[in-house]
């Protein structure tokens, strides 16, 4: 699915900036890899101590797994793009690791969508009890999400089956069969559609949540300002990460995919679209470094255990507990877990 390790054969290629593709981008991915492994390793360690007692927690744990696995694909891309690895490594990137990259990226996106729905249901519709918020249902839904993403992506592994000679530069699309190219195009459109649907639902749900919380706190002046700021911060952090990390890539993805699978694009146009895709894909990859920050803002149990492990006292915890007991409102209880 990623064709970043490759360029056109010499007789068909335009002038290329190898400084960008073979040095700058690999170095940036190396930085993201180191930060991503460390941050998600710590996040996984902390979540190991967080009980899976709520659907919200289960979805977050799935995101941690997806981000960690996605981070493990970065070294293959780094070695392939920089030319430090053997040519067979580029084939492996085209056939396997790039597909795993996309699977885990979209798994993460879908689970953030499920979290927004779960928070909407609990905060805006607290009296509507439903089995969809049960732990068992959330675990089943998590399995279904992983299976569906794999079903969409695995054919890209199977259908990238064309033989390849020993070359220094490989174009991933040329390793696909005719059916593989069609599936590549269709699956990319489906994944892009999934993102935009989740992104729009995210905006709708969190707009409704914000209105609900602000209306709730209009009834009480105590701690109203601080709670509003906290709620706004939590919501803004999620939407900000989605907008910065994923929107640019999904704007660039469609024209880039068309340039791969349609013949009327000029060589120069293909190169420009490839650079756009590479840099926006890097932004998407950087999401693995930002998600742990979201966990800290979003999940109170995560925050409490992390601070406990680091021996950092939580500020105003007593005031928060008193406020919850005094008001006894479901919306208020959910403020720290948006």
Curated annotation (Swiss-Prot):
Keyword Signal applies: no
Protein name: P2Y purinoceptor 14
GO terms assigned for molecular function: G protein-coupled purinergic nucleotide receptor activity; G protein-coupled UDP receptor activity
Main location: membrane
Localization of this protein: Cell membrane
Membrane topology (Cytoplasmic): 51-55, 118-139, 210-234, 300-338
Disulfide feature: 94-172
Keywords from the named record: Cell membrane, Disulfide bond, G-protein coupled receptor, Glycoprotein, Membrane, Receptor, Transducer, Transmembrane, Transmembrane helix
Membrane-protein topology: Multi-pass membrane protein
GO biological process terms, semicolon-separated: G protein-coupled receptor signaling pathway; hematopoietic stem cell homeostasis
Taxonomic source organism: Homo sapiens (Human)
Residues bearing carbohydrate: 3, 161
Tissue: Highest expression in the placenta, adipose tissue, stomach and intestine, intermediate levels in the brain, spleen, lung and heart, lowest levels in the kidney.
Coiled-coil annotated residue ranges, if any: none
Role description: Receptor for UDP-glucose and other UDP-sugar coupled to G-proteins. Not activated by ATP, ADP, UTP or ATP.
Family classification: Belongs to the G-protein coupled receptor 1 family.
Membrane-spanning ranges: 30-50, 56-76, 97-117, 140-160, 189-209, 235-255, 279-299
Gene Ontology, cellular component aspect: membrane; plasma membrane
Positions on the Extracellular side per record topology: 1-29, 77-96, 161-188, 256-278
Any one Pfam family match given in the protein's UniProt record, by short name: 7tm_1
């Amino acid at each position: 699915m990623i064709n970043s390790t490759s360029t056109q054969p010499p007789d068909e290629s335009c002038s290329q900036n190898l400084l960008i593709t073979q040095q700058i981008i690999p170095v940036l991915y190396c930085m993201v890899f180191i930060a991503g492994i460390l941050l998600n390793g710590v996040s996984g360690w902390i979540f190991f101590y967080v009980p899976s007692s709520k659907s919200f927690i289960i979805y977050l744990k799935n995101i941690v797994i997806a981000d960690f696995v996605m981070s493990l694909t970065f070294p293959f891309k780094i070695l392939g793009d920089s030319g430090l690895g053997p040519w067979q490594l580029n084939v492996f990137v085209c056939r396997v690791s790039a597909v795993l990259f996309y699977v885990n990226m979209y798994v993460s996106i879908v689970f953030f969508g499920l979290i927004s729905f779960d928070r909407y249901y609990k905060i805006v519709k607290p009296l509507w009890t439903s089995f969809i918020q049960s732990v068992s249902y959330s675990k089943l839904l998590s399995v279904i999400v992983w299976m569906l993403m794999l079903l969409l992506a695995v054919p890209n592994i199977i259908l990238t089956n064309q033989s390849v000679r020993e070359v220094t530069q490989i174009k991933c699309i040329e390793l696909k069969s005719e059916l593989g190219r069609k599936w590549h195009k269709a699956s990319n459109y489906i994944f892009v559609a999934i993102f935009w649907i989740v992104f729009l639902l995210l905006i709708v749900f969190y707009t409704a949540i914000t209105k609900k919380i602000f209306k709730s706190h209009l009834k009480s002046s105590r701690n109203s300002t601080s709670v509003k700021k906290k709620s706004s911060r939590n919501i803004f952090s999620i939407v900000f990460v989605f907008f910065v990390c994923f929107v640019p890539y999904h704007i660039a993805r469609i024209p880039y995919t068309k340039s791969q699978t349609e013949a009327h694009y000029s060589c120069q146009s293909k190169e420009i679209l490839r650079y756009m895709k590479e840099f926006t894909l890097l932004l998407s990859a950087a999401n693995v470094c930002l998600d742990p920050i979201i966990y800290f803002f979003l999940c109170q149990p995560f925050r409490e255990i992390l601070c406990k492990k680091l021996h950092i006292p939580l500020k105003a915890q007593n005031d928060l507990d008193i406020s919850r007991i005094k008001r006894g409102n479901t919306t208020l209880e959910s403020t720290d877990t948006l």
